[in-house]
Structures are given as C-alpha cells and as structure tokens.
Regions:
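Conserved small/polar residues in nucleotide/adenosyl-binding loops
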Residues: 174-176
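Glycine-enriched alpha-helix->loop->beta-strand junction motifs that scaffold or abut catalytic
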Residues: 26, 88-96, 114-122, 137-146, ...
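Conserved sugar-transfer catalytic core signal across GT-A, GT-B, and GT-C glycosyltransferases
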Residues: 86, 132, 161
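Metal-dependent enolase-superfamily TIM-barrel catalytic cores that perform enediolate-based chemistry
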Residues: 2-111, 116
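Glycine-rich beta-to-alpha transition loops that act as phosphate-gripper elements at the mouths
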Residues: 71-77, 103-104, 123-130, 153-155
Length: 176
C-alpha cells in the first residue's frame, strides 16, 4: 500500500482507502509503507511513534483479521531499543513481518528484534552479496531475507540466498 498526501490525516486515510480496496479485490496479503519519520519519511512528515501506531491500527482495522499484513517502516528507528519501545505493543495487530526497522548493518539490533519483537523481522533489500545475507541470517537472526535481484548479483545469487535462507529455516522473499 503506497500512501498519498502531505498531512498525517491524508497519509493515514489514503492507506486505509488502499487497504479497503485491496480487501475488496480479494487480496490475501498486503505490505504497507508506514513512514512517518526517519530517513525516508513520506513527504517530509515528522510524526511520533504514537502516530505510527495509529496508522498501523487503522490499516489493520480496514483489512480485518483474515488478511496478512506486512509493515515497512524503512529504517524508522536508530536501534532495537528504540524500535522495541513501540513494536512490542503491536502484537494485537497480528503483523506478519516488520521490514527494515533499523539500518541493515546493525546486526546486533536485528538479533535483539528477532528475540523480542512480536512479529517476524525482514530485511536485506540493500545488501549486495550472499555473504552479507549469511551474516544477517545467522548473526542478525532475521526471519525473512529480502534480496533485491538487481542489487544482490542477479537471479543466480538470489537463488543461493533463498537456498541459504531455507537451509536455516528462514523465509526468502524477493524485495519489491
């Protein structure tokens, strides 16, 4: 779900409208951007974590309980401690995975997120080698590896990353 608008209300309401449309079209899963702050904040928005939670709650309510919801916060927080202050309370939203809560090179934070967050953790879209993925999977303990075929060395390397993920009981989803 890709938002539009230049205010918090427009942003939230556009994501709710997209969620309702996805539901009406019979989608079984959706990934929603929720970028109200951080390096990739939508239209320069600068909202607090309570507002981020408000958007997640509104999208989940619009989708209902039977559609998988994935949330991409695009490096919203500086570390796991900061992220967990918010996402520990998101269990009620039944999020399938949380994408890129912190910068991908913060392996320690990813491991902590895996251990303490109430949802799967996904990352990897900017990684360029299978060796980086191996580190993120083994030491960062991510649940979902997300290679971007155009960055990770092509389809052959993406397949190797997928195989490594599978061998380590992790999911691998091509990043879109």
């Amino acid at each position: 779900l890709q938002p539009v608008g230049h205010s918090f209300e427009e942003y939230r309401d556009s994501l709710v409208a997209w969620a309702e449309k996805a539901k009406s079209l019979g989608f079984k899963a959706v990934k929603s951007e929720v970028t109200l702050n951080g390096p990739y904040a939508h239209s320069g928005l600068n909202e607090n974590d309570e507002r981020t939670t408000e958007v997640v709650a509104a999208v989940r309510k619009a989708l209902g309980p039977d559609i998988y919801l994935m949330i991409d916060v695009q490096y919203r927080w500086k570390d796991a401690e900061e992220a967990l202050r918010t996402v520990k309370d998101w269990a009620e939203f039944d999020i399938y995975f949380l994408e890129t809560p912190v910068w991908t090179d913060d392996i320690k934070s990813y491991a902590q997120m895996h251990d303490e967050a109430p949802m799967k953790i996904a990352a990897g879209e900017w990684l360029s080698t299978r060796y980086e993925f191996e580190d993120l999977i083994i030491n960062g303990k991510i649940d979902v590896a997300q290679p971007d075929v155009g960055r990770c060395g092509g389809l052959t390397e993406a397949k190797k990353i997928a195989k490594f993920s599978q061998d380590n009981n992790r999911l691998s989803l091509i990043h879109i």
